[in-house]
Amino acid sequence: MSRKSGSRSSSKRSKKSGGGSNVFDMFTQRQVAEFKEGFQLMDRDKDGVIGKTDLRGTFDEIGRIATDQELDEMLADAPAPINFTMLLNMFAERQTGESDDDDVVAKAFLAFADEEGNIDCDTFRHALMTWGDKFSSQEADDALDQMDIDDGGKIDVQGVIQMLTAGGGDDAAAEEA
């Protein structure tokens, strides 16, 4: 039960609230609101659970065709139906597992990739400005300036993953780039 101490109230650190079982305590109010916004975007049928149809619709919206097998594998990662609390628990598990950080980054970018392993620049720019910590137009442009974009407006996912994960603690890999 290791909790990150970057929460809003460090004075309550010594107090245990229910043995740390409240996943909402692991995130700031802003983070919870952003997760909720993302959940609501994904819960297309508004039944409070992200199912296969919801995932398919989300992938379709970002221009990524996902196979039934891919969708089934994503849903199988959850130990129970994915309601909002389960989604938060899944993010919390990922956040506390430091060795998974690079894998999480890779999976996030691969979710946007087409069959050739590329991301459409315009689709990615739109996602940066729409979801999570929304980028401004200038911030999105700055981020895209750091990426190799081919003449067709495509970004190589593996190049982005390597760029982002190389500095994650392996100084030799960071110097190599």
UniProtKB/Swiss-Prot annotation:
GO terms for molecular function: calcium ion binding. One of its GO terms (cellular component) is myosin complex. It comes from the Eukaryota. Keywords: Allergen, Calcium, Metal-binding, Motor protein, Muscle protein, Myosin, Repeat. Residues 1-16 have a biased composition (Basic residues). Residues 1-24 are annotated as: Disordered. Residues 13-30, 22-48, 49-66, 58-90, 79-99, 118-141 are annotated as: IgE-binding epitope. Residues 30-65, 135-170 form the EF-hand domain. Expressed in tail muscle (at protein level). Ca(2+) binds at residues 43, 45, 47, 54. Myosin is a hexamer of 2 heavy chains and 4 light chains. This is Myosin regulatory light chain 2. It comes from Penaeus vannamei (Whiteleg shrimp).
